[in-house]
Amino acid sequence: MSVSLIASDQFRIVVGLGKSGMSLVRFLASRGIAFAVADTREQPPELETLRRDYPQVEVRCGELDVDFLCRANELYVSPGLALATPALQQAAARGVKLSGDIELFARHAKAPIVAISGSNAKSTVTTLVGEMAAKAGKRVAVGGNLGTPALDLLADDIELYVLELSSFQLETTDQLNAEVATVLNISEDHMDRYSGLPAYHLAKHRIFRGARQVVVNRQDALSRPLPVEGRPCWTFGLNPPDFKAFGLREVDGEKYLAFEFQTLMPARELKVRGAHNQSNALAALALGHAAGLPFEPMLEALREFGGLAHRCQWVRERNGVNWYDDSKATNVGAALAAIEGLGADIEGKLVLIAGGDGKGAEFTALREPVKRFCRAVVLLGRDAERLAEALGDAVPLVRVKTLDDAVQQCAELAQAGDAVLLSPACASLDMFKNFEERGRLFAQAAGGLA
């Protein structure tokens, strides 16, 4: 049996049958809303699941049919599909609303939302805030762009939602109405999808629509919403904090995480290393504080947090050299954070592995930090030559074809006291299934060194 295609206020089409698309299917079906599914791919990832669990739902695969899309009054568009897709634009011109799973989630969520975006660190900070809330005894649900799709989190007993949100998800979100929202930082990313940094910036800042409180990185002007008047604004940064601010204070030669003029805990008690991880901890404290969490359980969560996989994750020590997997550094900003954060935290130098699919980004910002902190850079992947041009003669450059070759070169180049860092500044899809596979293979190769 096929879903009726009679246009009505209750007919929707889910465009894109991946993880978030399948969560939309479950949500709409559970509420008895008539819908169909479309996907530009002939074999979308969740097609078998849809046909098994919802055989009555009509699904169209392949090129999008505008007339078909216009039979609905609202399209829920997958984050992976650009809104500039001609068929979507034509449907919108004919009066069809373009929306997404986060907009639908916001309409139905009954508990406060902590909303987190940014070019980098959003998964780490989202996880931290979730763990802080759990330590505080809250019934908390964590997800969005990280882990569980937002719609699958909806439940009547939840006391707090903590969501990681991408710019792609925010493009289809008109009014999130978060209790507290933040853009942790902004640097070039997804320039293959956006016309430039201003368009990317605008997409990120949709997170602030309807937010009752905001958290701002005071060391990144692009993270500040305009205007902030009329709602509480908390800040975080690596400099000393003042009113309504979290930061670092030095007391008797030791650095402390601090709120206003109150020291909270020594920075050395964090298990994760580097200034960027101190910044992440301060951001999480600011968000948790804005959401009403007490300091004691938040600090306990910080002391226990060992970091996420593929985010400056320690792999092994060999001959006095530590190896780190930062495969999640899929853009320049993330790689900069790792190079500067880890580089300042070790005795020796970094031997960096970089390269992959640069997504149209500009790499010149890497030159000075690489010159300061790196002994050498091993390059691989599609944009290795673009990286080489940007780095120039800052340090010796070695070009390789495979990740195994990169690991072998690093083993030869690194000296005792150094660290080998996989922080590619690029996406992985030119050579690997995803950044997780890239990180696993790096750790496997490093672990196999005699």
UniProtKB/Swiss-Prot annotation:
Reactions catalysed: UDP-N-acetyl-alpha-D-muramoyl-L-alanine + D-glutamate + ATP = UDP-N-acetyl-alpha-D-muramoyl-L-alanyl-D-glutamate + ADP + phosphate + H(+)
Protein name from the UniProt record: UDP-N-acetylmuramoylalanine--D-glutamate ligase
Family under the similarity heading: Belongs to the MurCDEF family.
SUPFAM superfamilies in the cross-refs: MurCD N-terminal domain, MurD-like peptide ligases, catalytic domain, MurD-like peptide ligases, peptide-binding domain
InterPro entries per the UniProt record, alphabetical: Mur-like_cat_sf, Mur_ligase_C, Mur_ligase_C_dom_sf, Mur_ligase_cen, MurD
A Pfam family reported for this protein in Swiss-Prot or TrEMBL: MurD-like_N
Keyword terms, alphabetized: ATP-binding, Cell cycle, Cell division, Cell shape, Cell wall biogenesis/degradation, Cytoplasm, Ligase, Nucleotide-binding, Peptidoglycan synthesis
EC number in record: 6.3.2.9
GO molecular function: ATP binding; UDP-N-acetylmuramoylalanine-D-glutamate ligase activity
Enzyme class: ligase
Gene: murD
Sites where the protein binds ATP: G118, S119, N120, A121, K122, S123, T124
Pathway connected to this protein: Cell wall biogenesis; peptidoglycan biosynthesis
Gene3D superfamilies per UniProt: Mur ligase, C-terminal domain (3.90.190.20), Mur-like, catalytic domain (3.40.1190.10), NAD(P)-binding Rossmann-like Domain (3.40.50.720)
Example of a GO cellular component annotation carried by this entry: cytoplasm
UniProt organism field: Pseudomonas putida (strain ATCC 47054 / DSM 6125 / CFBP 8728 / NCIMB 11950 / KT2440)
Gene Ontology process terms (BP): cell division; cell wall organization; peptidoglycan biosynthetic process; regulation of cell shape
Localization: Cytoplasm
Function according to Swiss-Prot or TrEMBL: Cell wall formation. Catalyzes the addition of glutamate to the nucleotide precursor UDP-N-acetylmuramoyl-L-alanine (UMA).
